[in-house]
Amino acid sequence: YYPMQNTIIKNWFPAGERGRANTAWILGQSLAPALAMPLYTWIIAEHSWRHTFYFSFSLTLLPIVLIYFFTSNFPQENKYVNVLELQKINKSTTEEVLHKNSSEKISVVERAKVYLCNSNFWILLAVFSSNSMLSWGVVTWLPTYLNTERGFSWANVGWMSALPFIFGLLFKVLAGFIVDKTDRKGMVMFVSAMLCAASILTGVNISNNFFAAIVISFGIGASSMQLPCVFTLLQSMVPAEAMSSAAGALNGMAVGFGALSPVLIGFILSVTHNFYFVMYILIGIVVIGGLFSLLFSRDRSRLLN
């Protein structure tokens, strides 16, 4: 998924449009969970749980058809791209290549060296991992927090758990436009982290349960501003030939750290029985990621070094 996303956007979009392109691609990560909960509940109630699988299978056919018939590896290979569009893409995009001879086969090791030996890749991994740890922790434990600590019924927890994804959708759209307009990816990621941390900190200390849930959800949604920036930065620092493997490595390692988050939260709860302590740890992780983001706001010319 992420290797394909980053490769297509790297090859098809000028640098000044990649923020919006990445946003458009990943909007489904916020839109789908927000819609899936009530929709799948209705399908199960009206039909059966098996029908959710039939419905999911039907949905996957649409992108398969669109990708197979209307896209290609490069815009030069696509019959639907006209000359003016092709000129705009080629003029606005600076292509970095590993070899001048395009027929020469590039080894896996050589591709990996391009990003693994780039310090910016590891800084970006730190930012993405902090975001992933927040996301996985929230998806796993937010419903329990709202039920046990805030006293919401499970019926109310259902729609409240969708709030972070709704806010996330709005913040992703905003980030995509800001990134393409200003090219300040590092600063956008930093502001996103600070807004997230401040909102969660405020939310856990608000006595009104309803407003607390909204403020916490707002903060979690604000963290979504980092995602278009992460992928746009990756596409700026890695040549097209290594894009797919770099995206896979970045996402794979970030998901690995993210998967530790629910386990870490569960362990802390078993020892402290204190959800506030868990929230403060998540806030700390987000702030650390935000501080790493500042390194990208210092000097944008160092991305390809």
Describe the function of each predicted region.
Residues A45-F57, F267-I285:
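A membrane-interface helix-boundary motif in multi-pass transporters
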Residues R184-L233:
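C-terminal transmembrane helical hairpin of 12-TM major facilitator-type secondary transporters
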Residues F171-D183, L269:
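Helix-to-loop junctions at the C-terminal end of transmembrane segments
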Residues R111-V173, L227, F231, S261:
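Extracytoplasmic gate region of multi-pass secondary transporters
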Residues Q235-N274:
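A late C-terminal transmembrane helix in Major Facilitator Superfamily
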Residues W25-N78:
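Helix-loop-helix hairpin linking two adjacent transmembrane segments in secondary transporters
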Residues Q76-I123:
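Juxtamembrane intracellular "pre-TM" segments in multi-pass secondary transporters
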Residues Y1-G28:
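Cytoplasmic helix-loop-helix junction between adjacent transmembrane helices
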